[in-house]
Amino acid sequence: MDRNYDTDTLVEVIGGLEPFETFLLSLFFPGVITFETSSISFDKVSEDMRLAPFVSPLVAGKVMKQLGSEMRTFKPAYLKPKDVVDPERVFVRRPGEQIGGTLSPEQRRNAIIADILADHRKRILRRMEHMAAQILLTGKVVVEGEDYPTQEVDFYRSPGNTLALTGATRWSESTAKPLDDVESWAAQAEAPITTLIMDRHAYRNFVRFEEVQKLLDGRRNSRSELETGPDTGRLYSYKGTLGSDLEVWVYSGYYRDEAKQKIPFLPPNTVIAGSAAVDGVRAYGAIIDSSAGYRAMEMFPKNWINQDPAVEYVMTQSAPLPIPRHPDAALAITVA
């Protein structure tokens, strides 16, 4: 009897798992596009922000030269987390299971496979959050891995959208003017800025300024509201609104490197200024595996059993690339 799960069953399981919370990915890259080829194709089209020319009603309309469109393709590296279904665990009571055990070994096996799939999903989404952070910080993403040549995908964000405050303008200095900085960034972005995302160091510097405190002092009588209390342990925290629609968030998301060191997605004293106008999507190349049926999908889970020695495996494959349609709608600033 074949005890392997078919693709559709595993896809249904992984799709029904409780979602793993991402922040940057969810905020700036909400869309999903799946490709039926292993390569991702995308057009780099610069939005034409020129004014329509005024002409006399008696003069023929003026033809405006179409901006060029560049087709590029990229074959992303596979993410392939893989785990063994430990046969010893099927005989051990699971957390929350009644003393004496109410689950059969087969039921525990199913639960273990679901746990593994949930972990795979988290690991893949955490990698994509890291890719989203790179794109927002630099306008580029570096893709590298075992047996995969290091490649840099450049989305051609304007160099001026990656900034570093210097000298007396740094928020660590008493001479800085953070609200003036925010106004300047808003003028520089391709689209209106509606969100400021700060790491905790940048936010701590931001709220200590008198000009910011004046807004805080008048927050009950104005539309400027900022929460100055400590975070409650969440990886992201809404701090309030400046003016009518500029949301302020603190983000403390992180991952661990191979040495188990904690690495924040946003370096210390970083601010991301942007909005939904980034219009990012999560693109997925097809997984070239006959078991997947050569279908377009975000994640392809599979399991199989080697007979000698008898070992059961669960693996999830994905070939993702976050793509910002409008990279100049976001800026990254080192403020101290």
Task: Please tell me what each predicted stretch does.
Residues 81-157, 181, 186-202, 310-318:
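Long, contiguous amphipathic alpha-helices that act as assembly "spine/axial" helices in icosahedral shell
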Residues 65-69, 137, 144, 220-224:
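Glycine-rich loops and low-complexity Gly/Arg-rich segments
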Residues 213-336:
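Sequence/fold signature of self-assembling virion shell proteins
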